[in-house]
Amino acid sequence: TNCFPNTLDTTVHFRKGKDGKPDTFVYTGDIHAMWLRDSGAQVWPYVQLANSDPELKTMLAGVINRQFKCINIDPYANAFNDGPKGGEWMSDLTDMKPELHERKWEIDSLCYPLRLAYQYWKTTGDASIFDEEWIQAITNILRTFKEQQRKDGVGPYKFQRKTERALDTVTNDGLGNPVKPVGLIVSTFRPSDDATT
């Protein structure tokens, strides 16, 4: 019974953004970074209660707003900092930015924000989350999915890390294993953050 309030007390950080919209940063466990998939899963149980608690509803809208802002910073990233702080993975051989905690391309990182936004809208009827930021994020998601079908080459994403763990880096000069472009979307990393093989 304590996990519902504990999650809100220890991992959810709500504020109003510079644009006046709700902005909720959700820490993933003990790491002060926000994984797109994990943050969506962490707040998922609260969606069913959104209509009975206006503050909870606003917090959820803030998570969705933040997720789509993150996607617009980099749709290939899986985890983000709370601002341009840099971090331990800045030396990864990929297009790192100071807003990124980690840049491991995982298809679920783009699917979970869509799932959360849809369920929030379906439950609350609140369409305010579907604004210009959302339109840009959807455009970036669709572009990324198309790029990673790899019908027109390997796409812009590459990733390499100096590590002793084989599944923490990507083979083939950071492009991953060759694939036959049949229309499926290549996900370079699994939800576990391990490279696909």
Features from the language model and the residues they span:
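Aromatic-rich carbohydrate-recognition surfaces in CAZymes
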Residues: 32-60, 64-168
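Acidic/His metal-coordination segments adjacent to aromatic residues that form catalytic metal sites
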Residues: 17-26, 86-104, 167-197
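Generic surface-pattern signal
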Residues: 4-13, 72, 150, 190
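Generic structural signal of hydrophobic/aromatic residues within well-ordered alpha-helices
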Residues: 1-4, 67, 185
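Low-complexity, Ser/Thr/Pro/Gly-enriched N-terminal "stalk/linker" regions
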Residues: 1-37, 62
